[in-house]
Amino acid sequence: MSLKEFADALPDYAKDIRLNVGSLLGDQTLTEQRKYGLLLACAHGSGYKPIVEATEAEVAGKLSPEAANAARAAAAVMAMNNVYYRFVHLASNKEYGQMPAKLRMNVIGSPGIEKDDFELFSLAVSAMNGCGLCIDSHEKVLRQHGVAADVIQTAARVGAVIKAAATVHATAV
């Protein structure tokens, strides 16, 4: 099942989500690696296997093995980092922010693809997971690399739409 077929199976009350998935698939503003990498990272970031499977089918042959692995790695490391750094950010005791994280995250330094694309995937998953500290960190790096605000906004939209599609599909009555 493709991502389009997945979206087409959403109930009528989620018509807007279905249309938004179609808009993302038809997006011409992002590079292919960014578009399909974002979709894959966000699908994995949702933690919902049916949308992961549909997105894996959608991106097959459209992403290099390195880019697909980087998208999956972004989702994996953000699953860890977003929880930890959201804790650091929200805890009243600021001492935690001064302590070393002691978490392995080597993939951030060596993702196997362009740094800005990996940061974009990480930002989208961080938006899905609600980690403000991570969003700010990734957005800052992206802007330093010259990534335009509309590209960053698109990444956040991908996260929002994929999260909504996964949630609706998982809870449809």
Swiss-Prot record:
Disulfide bonds join C131-C134. Its EC number is 1.11.1.28. One of its GO terms (molecular function) is peroxiredoxin activity. GO terms for biological process: cell redox homeostasis; response to oxidative stress. Signal peptide: none annotated. InterPro entries: AhpD (IPR004674), AhpD-like (IPR029032), AhpD_core (IPR004675), CMD-like (IPR003779). The keyword NAD does not apply. It comes from the Bacteria. Belongs to the AhpD family. Antioxidant protein with alkyl hydroperoxidase activity. Required for the reduction of the AhpC active site cysteine residues and for the regeneration of the AhpC enzyme activity. HAMAP family: AhpD (MF_01676). This is Alkyl hydroperoxide reductase AhpD.
